[in-house]
Amino acid sequence: RVTENLEPLDRYLDEKKAKRRHRVRRYMTRPVMSTYLKTEVLGEENVKGLEGAFILVPNHSSHLDAPMVFSLLPDWITEKLATGAAADYFYRKRGISSLTSVFFNTYPILRKGKRESVEHGKAAGMTGRLLRAGVPILVFPEGTRSRSGKIGQPKAGAAALAMQVGVPIVPIAMLGGHEAMPVG
């Protein structure tokens, strides 16, 4: 069977693991982010009542983007949130993938034209599988960080998947990440 080789969804669905990841972020990520960045969240009222699976789609200009999302959004949005991470970048070494997994509940995404990681075959279709299981996801639709800080051209994948699975998309505009920690 094809599904026998796929990455199990257990760790993304396990309540105890979600609570542990959440505590790590609350007591480590949030204090670090609030120490170094002055932040402001606008429009939180637009997501009141959002539940179940959805796709968060922020622009991507810095390695600070995922920590900002997890630090600034309400707990009820981020507690079970899984993050699509570039397989060729974050899954090259087990230590990096383990660390990002603890902090951001990551799963590998293969980017077009990039070298496949060993993990990719097991994670095929992971975004759709997570959404169908009720797990909200965070993906950066540009597919990579902006080199200039300007919003890049989004790929169609998140929108196509949202329509296919029938989940809402929550756009997020993030400003200042590139200035605080530019690419390179």
How should these model regions be labeled?
Residues L9, V24, L99-T100:
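Generic structural signal of hydrophobic/aromatic residues within well-ordered alpha-helices
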Residues Y12-R25:
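Helix-enriched interaction subdomains in cytosolic or periplasmic regions
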Residues A18, T35-G184:
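Soluble catalytic domains of membrane acyltransferases
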